[in-house]
Regions:
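Cytosolic regulatory regions built on CNB/CRP/Popeye-like sensor folds
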Residues: 1-160
Length: 160
């Protein structure tokens, strides 16, 4: 199987790209770059400029946010997952650090190719909004849980 066909097959399985026809996926794969990482290598770091997003072709990576108390793991991502889109959508520095936890193959999708795809296929934009809304919901649940635990600790310590 050719590398381009393999990339298109993987892109077809990415939920965000499910409604995109094969010729457009082939063009996206052709205009993107396969980048390989070894375990423990960093794809990008929190605070870096965001000029691309990545589709995980194979392997796994961990997503971390840096805090004053050290890094916090936010998620583990694997084949067909998409990372790095927030920085290019919002034109902000990277909001997290992504580190390969195994040998990793990615498809690096540049900002222009990404926006061309979203322009031509609005359902991709809707899919991205849905994924971001899901992540925000999960973050809100986590924040609520942590806030509740903090309040409980304060009450137990007599500081509330």
């Amino acid at each position: 199987m050719s590398l381009l066909k393999n990339e298109v097959d993987i892109l077809r399985r990415v939920p965000l790209f499910s409604g995109v026809d094969a010729p457009k996926l082939k063009l996206l794969a052709f205009t993107s770059q396969v980048v390989r990482y070894r375990a423990q290598e960093t794809l990008f770091a929190q605070g870096d400029a965001g000029d691309s997003a990545y589709v995980i072709l194979s392997g796994k990576a961990r997503v971390f946010a840096n805090t004053d108390n050290g890094p916090i793991e936010l998620a583990e991502v694997g084949e067909t997952d998409f990372v790095g889109e927030i920085a290019i959508l919002c034109d902000v520095p990277r909001t997290a650090t992504v580190v390969a936890s195994t040998n990793l193959a990615t498809l690096r999708v540049g900002k222009d190719a990404f926006f061309n795809l979203v322009t031509q296929f609005p359902q991709v934009g809707v899919g991205i909004m849905s994924e971001l809304a899901h992540r925000l919901h999960q973050t809100t649940l986590n924040l609520t849980d942590l806030s509740s635990k903090l309040r409980q600790l304060e009450m137990e310590g007599g500081r509330a």
